[in-house]
């Protein structure tokens, strides 16, 4: 649909009114958060092998302390994950994943005012996390990995992040190919939105994520960053997660993920300038400071 509309294809006449309606429609609050400004989602990896901080917060108490620190820095959402989905990562079963994240969620739910998000591909983990008090589901497979996830996510009543990934973590960087990376991913996400709506999840509860770094080359990632505004045509809130990712290292010659903060801030501001509503980041305080300067300049320009 997106490709037809932008190329003037056969479905243009039928698709253009829908696209314009999606662009104009106000976005619903997400888990009680108004989307009138960019929201920060702080990353809490309760894993031994995540690409940027694997092992640092694997222990329960360390993960809880890290989450509370991110909240103190201004995180609106805390995204808690127990399975690394970095390129080449091995999967873990649902029981092990819950063993990692369950105690952290249960400890944070009564202690934090930030919204809690569960970063998982598994229906059982979604179900248990919802019962434990999370406010949001973030699935890097867009509810495709687990056949039960569509129904489970619908039953929770929670908002869901649908992320694009080509392949699975073990194979996604094996020569990824697209005819047009932006239009292909926009159409793919559109099909996932339709699947969710058919399962009883309304569009107002969906957030789309083009999946920077997941089955993409450097050129693909840069192309997506330059065209993020197109994804608003899907009628959902938009999230990006570019923080510390390897494309920044390839572009700048920065091998250590900890040294990629400047590039991460640049990516966040590129997203904010194109109306992205949620920024998934490791460095909440620095991102909030960068956004404050950007927002201040934007408001000053808009003032009479």
Task: Please report, for each region that a protein language model flagged, where it lies by residue.
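Glycine-/small-residue-enriched capping loops at alpha/beta junctions
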Residues: 1-31, 46
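Active-site-adjacent loop and "lid" segments of alpha/beta metabolic enzymes
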Residues: 6, 19-25, 35, 52-66, ...
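Glycine/alanine-rich phosphate-binding loops at beta-alpha junctions
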Residues: 23-30, 59-61, 71, 78-79
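Short, hydrophobic/glycine-enriched beta-strand segments
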Residues: 39-45
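Conserved hydrophobic/aromatic pocket- or pore-lining residues that grip, position, or stack substrates
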Residues: 44, 74, 137
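Catalytic domains of carbohydrate-active enzymes, especially glycoside hydrolases
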Residues: 65-81, 274-275
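Short coil/turn linkers that connect adjacent helices within long alpha-helical scaffolds
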Residues: 199-201
């Amino acid at each position: 649909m997106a490709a037809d509309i932008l190329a003037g294809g056969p479905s243009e006449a039928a698709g253009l009114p829908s696209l314009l309606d999606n662009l104009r429609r106000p976005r619903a609050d997400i888990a009680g958060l108004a989307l009138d400004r960019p929201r920060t989602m702080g990353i809490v990896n309760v894993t031994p092998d995540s690409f940027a901080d694997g092992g640092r917060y694997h222990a329960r108490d360390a993960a809880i302390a890290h989450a509370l620190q991110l909240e103190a820095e201004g995180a609106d959402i805390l995204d808690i994950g127990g399975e690394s989905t970095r390129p080449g990562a091995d999967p873990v079963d649902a029981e092990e994943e819950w063993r990692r994240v369950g105690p952290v969620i249960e400890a944070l739910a009564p202690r934090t005012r930030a919204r809690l998000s569960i970063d998982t591909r598994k229906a059982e983990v979604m179900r248990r996390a919802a019962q434990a008090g999370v406010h949001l589901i973030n699935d890097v497979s867009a509810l495709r990995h687990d056949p039960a996830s569509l129904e489970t996510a619908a039953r929770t009543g929670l908002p869901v992040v649908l992320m694009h990934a080509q392949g699975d973590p073990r194979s996604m960087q094996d020569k990824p190919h697209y005819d047009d990376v932006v239009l292909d991913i926009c159409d793919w996400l559109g099909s996932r939105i339709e699947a969710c709506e058919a399962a009883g999840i309304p569009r107002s509860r969906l957030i789309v994520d083009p999946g920077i770094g997941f089955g993409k080359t450097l050129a693909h990632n840069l192309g997506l960053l330059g065209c993020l505004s197109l994804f608003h045509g899907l009628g959902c809130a938009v999230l990006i997660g570019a923080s510390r990712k390897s494309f920044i290292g390839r572009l700048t010659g920065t091998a250590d993920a900890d040294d990629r903060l400047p590039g991460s801030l640049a990516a966040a501001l590129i997203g904010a300038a194109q109306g992205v509503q949620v920024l998934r980041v490791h460095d909440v305080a620095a991102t909030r400071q960068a956004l404050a300067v950007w927002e201040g300049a934007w408001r000053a320009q808009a003032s009479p």
